[in-house]
Amino acid sequence: MKYEKLLPRFLEYVKVNTRSDENSTTTPSTQALVEFAHKMGEDMKALGLKDVHYLESNGYVIGTIPANTDKKVRKIGLLAHLDTADFNAEGVNPQILENYDGESVIKLGDTEFTLDPKDFPSLKNYKGQTLVHTDGTTLLGSDDKSGVAEIMTLAEYLLNINPDFEHGEIRVGFGPDEEIGVGADKFDVADFDVDFAYTVDGGPLGELQYETFSAAGAVIEFQGKNVHPGTAKNTMVNALQLAIDYHNALPEFDRPEKTEGREGFFHLLKLDGTPEEARAQYIIRDHEEGKFNERKALMQEIADKMNAEFGQNRVKPVIKDQYYNMAQIIEKDMSIIDIAKKAMENLDIVPIIEPIRGGTDGSKISFMGLPTPNLFAGGENMHGRFEFVSVQTMEKAVDTLLEIIRLNNEVVK
């Protein structure tokens, strides 16, 4: 194995349950995330990172790999998140499959679930590689503990294995709650103090992403008028029926399961209630600012039309922006994309530069003034039992970070 401790480090991390909690009001959202951040801080100190500190204000643990060059080069930041998605993360039992043949069905532990190339055709890309997958009962946590392990392995390489590798100052940060969309809300750009950064939070080999969705969340409250159904004619207003009518007024094909590429959508996350009152929760996504604003306006227009028909405010939407397409910031200076692209090409990795059908912590951090595109970390089928990662892809992620650092040495501030 190219980096001896990369896989053991990853396996150690994924066994810790750091599932974030969207219902929490604390930062981080769970005590487990606080404890894991402190554990990462101790690991960072053990590797030799300097100025390692945990920020109570935002749950980030930050450390520094000091420069070993007199060149005035740009300071680079590397970021990954410690939490995992909303799927069982207790008792993660990673399975290792060496020299995968690229065509066999992979059994997930003792469960009835499998990784079948017919369902997951990307498996054919991993012929001859070592895969880490789940036992079918949990997620794996490659999102984003692959990124965490890769950054730590990079730090180990620079500080302990090849300390003569020339580099400027590098700042490392691990934070909470990316999966519930609030991880970067309190990020401290001044404390991180770098010229540009990357999140190592992408998927398959070669992903290089600087364009995300713009995102909003919507909560629609429906006020009904409940009476006995036996005498309901011309009197009852069923709040659940209002919710159904509202949803049906949205464009039929603008849903996640019917869109791809640059197409945006409305996504109904949750619907509950009674005939008296109901509540629907949506997310709104689009890459283009104009279309994003049109989607939000449409949700209000539907409510206004329904209320006008009743002559009462029975449909009450609350729409809040969550994050914006970071391309608006990154495109002002594409040098950090160019350097990452060149790094991959130098390593015979084909860069995959496509819009993210989602967001990253970098979306918010970029709008705080720190351009932060996203690099591949290796995971596939993330957020569930079918998640897996290639050890060789993780190694290439470390290689890519090293090559970015090497190329950055050629750019004098």
From Swiss-Prot:
Record's cofactor remark: Binds 2 Zn(2+) ions per subunit.
Pfam families associated with the record: M20_dimer, Peptidase_M20
Binding residue positions for Zn(2+) 2: 143, 179, 383
Residues of the active site: 83, 178 (proton acceptor)
Protein keywords: Aminopeptidase, Cytoplasm, Hydrolase, Metal-binding, Metalloprotease, Protease, Zinc
A GO BP annotation: proteolysis
Activity-pH dependence: Optimum pH is around 8.
Chain ranges passing through the membrane: none
Source organism superkingdom: Bacteria
GO cellular component, one term: cytosol
Function: Cleaves the N-terminal amino acid of tripeptides.
Family: Belongs to the peptidase M20B family.
This protein's name: Peptidase T
Gene name of this polypeptide: pepT
